[in-house]
């Protein structure tokens, strides 16, 4: 981006969200992250918020805009998993994931885009997943929410595109995180065999894709799904 922007990243205290916030900070932007616990990277504003709680979001976004200015870039990253095979998954397992990963994104997008509409500029980037395109056994809840983000981004594009607002999905594949590092080596090797690139992505590779989408060079890209998966989900 050619000028400093106000960026909000939800779920910015670890993993991909943390890396995304770091990347925006390094590029000189004003960055806030929502967290339920912990803190975001050095140089950002960390605000306590739960995307399932509208009141906490109202307070958090008001604090961000009071300290950093109207939100110009939103990265909706906060998400949870409740993995279980279909026949064992409870209604609560399904509904909890939908409430965070889909309804939670709606709550944040609705609030953050108010200022974007007034400014006639905005970038909305939703963090999806390759399993939203491929499906995944034991993740009917999670994969359904990630697939739904594609429809959300495209509907935002149709509603708000004329106001200078873009909306896209970044769909990571397997990422090299503490969680994947704890998997048995044999299981890691099996996963890597499925990936044409033969390796997991780094969180920074996802973060750089997000910051590029937020920049001026990607201003004519909207309603797109950008895979960062080493070729795992190609054709979808």
Can you annotate each of these PLM segments?
Residues 129:
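Residue(s) in the substrate-gating loop at a strand-loop-helix junction
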Residues 134, 211, 222-236:
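Short C-terminal tail/terminal secondary-structure segment
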Residues 13-14:
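Conserved glycine-rich cofactor-binding loop
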Residues 195-206:
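A conserved structural motif in NAD(P)-dependent oxidoreductases
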Residues 85-86, 93-98, 180, 191:
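Substrate-binding pocket helix/loop in short-chain dehydrogenase/reductase
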Residues 109, 145, 153:
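Active-site helix of classical SDR
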Residues 114, 158-162, 219:
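Alpha-helical segment proximal to the catalytic Tyr-Lys
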């Amino acid at each position: 981006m050619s000028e400093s922007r106000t960026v909000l990243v939800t779920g910015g205290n670890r993993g991909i969200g943390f890396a995304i916030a770091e990347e925006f900070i390094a590029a000189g932007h004003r960055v806030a992250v929502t967290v339920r616990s912990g803190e975001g990277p050095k140089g950002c504003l960390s605000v306590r918020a739960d995307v399932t709680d509208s009141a906490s979001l109202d307070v958090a976004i008001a604090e961000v805009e009071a300290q950093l200015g109207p939100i110009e870039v939103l990265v909706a990253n906060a998400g949870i998993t409740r993995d279980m095979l279909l026949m064992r998954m409870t209604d609560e397992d399904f509904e909890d994931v939908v409430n965070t990963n889909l309804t939670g994104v709606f709550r944040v997008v609705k609030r953050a885009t108010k200022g974007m509409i007034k400014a006639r500029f905005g970038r909305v980037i939703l963090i999806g997943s390759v399993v939203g395109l491929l499906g995944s056994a034991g993740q009917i809840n999670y994969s359904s929410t990630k697939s739904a983000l594609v429809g959300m981004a495209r509907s935002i594009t149709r509603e708000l595109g004329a106001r200078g607002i873009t909306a896209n999905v970044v769909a990571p594949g397997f990422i090299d995180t503490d969680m994947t590092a704890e998997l048995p080596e044999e299981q890691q090797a099996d996963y890597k065999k499925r990936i044409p690139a033969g390796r997991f992505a780094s969180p920074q590779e996802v973060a750089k894709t997000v910051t590029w989408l937020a920049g001026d060079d990607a201003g004519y890209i909207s309603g797109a799904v950008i895979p960062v998966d080493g070729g795992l989900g190609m054709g979808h």
